[in-house]
Regions:
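Helix-loop-strand module that forms the ligand-binding subsite of alpha/beta enzymes
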Residues: 57-154
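Short beta-strand "acidic-cap" motif of Rossmann-like dinucleotide-binding folds
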Residues: 36
Length: 159
């Protein structure tokens, strides 16, 4: 199995970094292929400047991330929960990497968003892939159950 481990914490001395390192060190290399993305070591623009209506300039890190997303069978996300959500750096990476054509596609012409709103079907290009999430928080679990609902990666990508 091809496994991609993504660390979404900005601090290189964080508990998430320790979890990330432990996961990487303990994956059985005889049974699995492993790749890693440690967002706190990368320099990239996490801002999706034009939504998906206009293509942004190619960024080598984003292109490599998209290759790894297509390569992986299983994703492991490690990140803290801040303000009941994922860190902005991880959110920006998801916005820039899980784009139409990588995460999903439509056979219809025109705007991806308008086609979606009109109920037109789109193909899930990552179907069959799995993920694990290691999310840390300083708040008790009941806080998220009461105020935020289930903790998950934003599901607006149709993955």
């Amino acid at each position: 199995m091809n496994i991609l481990v993504i660390n979404g914490h900005l601090d290189k001395e964080s508990y998430c970094q320790a979890i990330f390192q432990t996961i990487v060190e303990n994956i059985d290399s005889k049974r699995h292929e492993l790749e890693m993305i440690n967002l706190n070591e990368e320099e990239f623009d996490p801002v999706l400047r034009y939504g998906y209506r206009q293509r942004m300039e190619d960024d080598p890190f984003i292109l490599r991330s998209q290759e790894l997303i297509q390569w992986a069978d299983h994703f492991i996300f490690v990140y803290p929960i801040w303000w009941s959500s994922i860190p902005s750096l991880l959110k920006g990476w998801i916005d820039r990497v899980f784009t139409p054509g990588i995460a999903c596609s439509t056979n219809n012409r025109g705007s991806f968003i308008l086609n979606y709103l009109r109920g037109r079907q789109f193909k899930k290009l990552l179907k069959g892939k799995t993920a694990s999430i290691y999310a840390t928080s300083m708040a008790p679990t009941w806080w998220y159950k009461v105020f935020s609902g289930p903790i998950n990666i934003p599901d607006s990508y149709g993955i």
